[in-house]
From Swiss-Prot:
InterPro entries: Rhodanese-like_dom (IPR001763), Rhodanese-like_dom_sf (IPR036873), SelU (IPR017582). The active site is at C97 (s-selanylcysteine intermediate). This is tRNA 2-selenouridine synthase. It comes from Escherichia coli (strain SMS-3-5 / SECEC). PROSITE patterns: RHODANESE_3 (PS50206). Its EC number is 2.9.1.3. Residues 14-137 form the Rhodanese domain. Belongs to the SelU family. NCBIfam families: PRK11784.1-1, PRK11784.1-3, tRNA_sel_U_synt. The gene is selU. One of its GO terms (molecular function) is tRNA 2-selenouridine synthase activity. Pfam families: Rhodanese. It is an enzyme of class 2 (transferase). CDD domains: RHOD_YbbB (cd01520). It comes from the Bacteria.
Length: 364
């Protein structure tokens, strides 16, 4: 059974999206995991805690004996069945535990006894995690062009369409504003960083990459923050600013935040609950900036939002949302972005409408 243990092996695993059967406890997996990993634990959280306590009090032999006692009989058989099925479904995969220690070796030996030879990651998740961190540090040293522009400028789509683009908001599962949440929960910080590293490695491997195209993001994207090595490089990067007509921006925002989000919520929850979730999503976004709007203006816009939702529910039209969206852009989002852009005006190297910026980026 060939084990993977070199730096290049670890990178190759991430680039290839190699399926990883992660046998750590769920609590460990939730704190941080690799993008292509599935969690099929040797021990659940309670069993792991009990073995850990035993190890501290009585030593490794007693802890190992307790582990075998806890994972025995029907419990062991159920977990064996799950591992066997995963191995057969992912014949090119690998086993992984925290450090390539006892847990992955135990599962590997049990599978071998059942007639399945399956490799493991020597060094475990810790080695893969260190590889992800180091890869991000190295790849972030390449030149970066940032795509800037006011809300609704189509920055994310422009980045997505570039072969050297990395969609930071897509990886973070958040669009970076008060209304930025999606139906997918955000990953833990470590898992987000691992996903970003894998995406950068894959993008770099597909081409002779000269520079990155990224969206001009703040440090935080929802609850995730950009790795400091990348954030530092972004603060030094050139910026291309999309300056589309206001009406085109409104069309994009209508499609993204009203039509698409309503569709996504109803698709996920059904018509009735989906509508309630959609309404709560919009109200939550507006409420998040209440303090900056001021109570009186917030109440006015919230009332317009309620009226727009009533119209949308009864007629299907989203046009009523313009009554609160337009002043929100004119009074809050646009002035805020222009203020932020003024502070880095010396880094702006190109301005134009969406298609012009896209063409300029391709020529870099």
């Amino acid at each position: 059974m060939q084990e993977r243990h070199t730096e290049q092996d670890y990178r190759a695993l991430l680039i290839a999206d190699t399926p990883i059967i992660d046998v750590r406890a769920p609590i460990e997996f939730e704190q941080g995991a690799m993008p292509a990993a599935i969690n099929l634990p040797l021990m659940n959280n309670d069993e792991r805690a009990a073995v850990g306590t035993c190890y501290k009090q009585q030593g490794s032999d007693a802890a190992l004996a307790l582990g075998h006692k806890l994972v025995a009989g029907e419990i062991r058989q159920q977990r064996m069945d799950a591992w066997r099925a995963a191995c057969l479904q992912n014949p090119q995969g690998i086993l992984c535990c925290a450090r390539g220690g006892q847990r992955s070796h135990i599962v590997q030996s049990w599978l071998h006894a059942a007639g399945i030879d399956y490799p493991l990651v020597e060094g475990g998740y810790k080695a893969l995690r260190q590889t992800a961190i180091q890869a991000t540090i190295e790849l972030a040293q390449k030149p970066i062009v940032l795509i800037g522009g006011c809300t609704g400028s189509g920055k994310t789509l422009l980045v997505q369409q570039q072969p050297n683009g990395v969609d930071l908001e897509g990886l973070a599962r958040h669009r970076g504003s008060a209304f930025g949440r999606t139906l997918q929960p955000q990953l833990s910080q470590a898992s987000f960083e691992n996903l970003l590293a894998a995406e950068m490695l894959k993008t770099d491997a597909r081409q002779n990459l000269r520079l990155w195209v990224l969206e001009d993001e703040s440090r935080m994207i929802g609850s995730n923050h950009l790795p400091e090595c990348l954030r530092e490089r972004m603060t030094q990067a050139a910026i291309a600013v999309v300056e589309d007509p206001f009406e085109i921006r409104l069309e994009r925002l209508n499609e993204e935040y009203f039509l698409r989000m309503h569709h996504d919520f109803t698709h996920a929850y059904g018509d009735e609950q989906g509508w309630q979730e959609y309404c709560e999503y919009l109200h939550h976004g507006l409420s998040a900036i209440k303090r900056r709007l001021g109570l009186q203006r917030y109440n006015e816009l919230a009332a317009r939002l309620d009226a727009a939702l009533t119209t949308q529910l009864t007629t299907g039209s989203t046009d009523g949302h313009l009554a609160w969206l337009v002043p929100l852009l004119e009074e809050y989002y646009d002035p805020m972005y222009r203020y932020q852009l003024e502070k880095k005006a010396e880094k702006v190297v190109f301005r134009g409408e969406w298609a012009e910026v896209a063409e300029w980026v391709k020529s870099r």
